[in-house]
C-alpha cells in the first residue's frame, strides 16, 4: 500500500504528517518553510509511494473559509498540476491547533517546548490526517 500525506498549510511554516504504509497510524513527519513546500513534496513522492494528499481546510466557526484559503488554493492547484496522478483533498481543520496544544499538555511537554510553533504545525497536520483516517473507517 501507499502512504497518505497531510499538510497543515501556513503562511510561514507548514506541518507535514504521513501514514504508515498500512494507512493505520498518522505520524508527524516535519515542518517545512512554506516557500519550500512544493519542492519538499515533489522529492518526498519520488522516494515514497503516496496515494493521496490531504490539505487542512481552514474554516471559521460560521463555516466560512478563513483568509488563508487565498494562499492554499493556488498552492493546491500548483500541486495538482505537478503531480496529477495523486489526488488532493481538503479536510476541515477547525480546532486542530487547539487539539495540538492540548496534546502537548497531555504529553507533559514543558512550556518552552509548547511554544515551538513548528512542533504545533506538525502535530496539527498529524491530527488532520488521523481524523481523515478515522472518518474513512466508518464509510
From Swiss-Prot:
Matching InterPro entries, A to Z?
A: RNaseH-like_sf, YqgF, YqgF/RNaseH-like_dom, YqgF/RNaseH-like_dom_sf
Keyword Nuclease among record annotations: yes
Q: Which GO terms describe its molecular function?
A: nuclease activity
Q: Name one GO cellular component term.
A: cytosol
Q: Where in the cell is it found?
A: Cytoplasm
- Top EC group: hydrolase
The biological process GO terms on file are: rRNA 5'-end processing
Question: Cross-referenced CDD domains, in alphabetical order?
Answer: YqgF (cd16964)
Its Enzyme Commission number? 3.1.-.-
State the coiled-coil residue ranges.
Answer: none
Q: Does the keyword Ligase apply?
A: no
* UniProt keyword annotations, A-Z: Cytoplasm, Hydrolase, Nuclease, Ribosome biogenesis
Chief place of localization: cytoplasm
What does the UniProt function comment say about this protein?
Answer: Could be a nuclease involved in processing of the 5'-end of pre-16S rRNA.
Family to which the UniProt record says this protein belongs: Belongs to the YqgF nuclease family.
UniProt-recorded name of the protein: Putative pre-16S rRNA nuclease
Organism per entry? Phocaeicola vulgatus (strain ATCC 8482 / DSM 1447 / JCM 5826 / CCUG 4940 / NBRC 14291 / NCTC 11154)
Amino acid at each position: 500500500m501507499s502512504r497518505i500525506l497531510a499538510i497543515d498549510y501556513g503562511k510561514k511554516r507548514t506541518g507535514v504528517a504521513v501514514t504508515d504504509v498500512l494507512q493505520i497510524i498518522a505520524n508527524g513527519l516535519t515542518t517545512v518553510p512554506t516557500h519550500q513546500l512544493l519542492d519538499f513534496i515533489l522529492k518526498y513522492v519520488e522516494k515514497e509511494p503516496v496515494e493521496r494528499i490531504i490539505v487542512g481546510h481552514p474554516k471559521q466557526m460560521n463555516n466560512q473559509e478563513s483568509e488563508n484559503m487565498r494562499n492554499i488554493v493556488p498552492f493546491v492547484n500548483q500541486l495538482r498540476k505537478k503531480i496529477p496522478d495523486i489526488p488532493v483533498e481538503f479536510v476541515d481543520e477547525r480546532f486542530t491547533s487547539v487539539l495540538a496544544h492540548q496534546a502537548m499538555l497531555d504529553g507533559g511537554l514543558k512550556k518552552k517546548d509548547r511554544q515551538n510553533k513548528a512542533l504545533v504545525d506538525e502535530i496539527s497536520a498529524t491530527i488532520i490526517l488521523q481524523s481523515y483516517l478515522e472518518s474513512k473507517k466508518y464509510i
